[in-house]
Amino acid sequence: MNIQHIHGVAPLYTNTFLIITNAKHGILIDAAAEPGVYLKALDEAGATLTHILLTHGHYDHVGAVAALKKATGCKVYMDPVDAQGSQLLPLTPDVLTDNWPANDELTIDELTFKIYHTPGHTRGGVCLSCYGLLFSGDTLFAGSCGRTDFPGGSMQEMARSLSLLAELPLPDATKVLPGHEGFSTLGQERSTNPYMNGAWY
């Protein structure tokens, strides 16, 4: 497995992640950069995009999805609640091809992603863990958490979601890769993030 960190377009510079499996299949976590940036990275790796996994439906995480789906025919996964229409940039049903598996596990080649439903920033937000990594979208940030004042947001649900993440059976060394800003570890967030224990709500 190889993973590349690719920034989305200005001014939000969303963190997106392109994973190349041993079989040269590309898995994209969120899609906020120009489509050509991802296609170039895939070409340089000799890989084909097969899956896009979306942490939630806000425009700054899905901007390249339609173009990439058209170019590659890849599968696109999003929680059905957010799939009803992403904020400011609706994605039509023909683009959003798949819901998360009923058992909340998705295996692609040698990788198995565990899906955690974490509403709060949006009603359909998810976090994904795989191979010692936690892709936390706009739920958990380094030292903070996602906003809850957008349509579909909820402080109460965010508090529950952050408590869920704090109690996950994942080691402290798990690397937290959020949708914006810098990276962290789950142990660091458990011990220092004031939003992780629910006391703020």
Write out the residue ranges for each language-model feature.
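Conserved beta-strand hairpin/beta-sheet module of binuclear metal-dependent hydrolase folds
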Residues: 1-45, 127-137
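Short Gly/Pro-enriched turn/cap motifs at secondary-structure boundaries
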Residues: 7-9, 97, 117-119
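Active-site HxH/HxHxD metal-binding segment of metal-dependent hydrolases
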Residues: 11, 33-111, 194-195
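Core dinuclear metal-dependent hydrolase active-site scaffold
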Residues: 18, 104-129
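Metallo-beta-lactamase
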Residues: 91, 117, 122-201
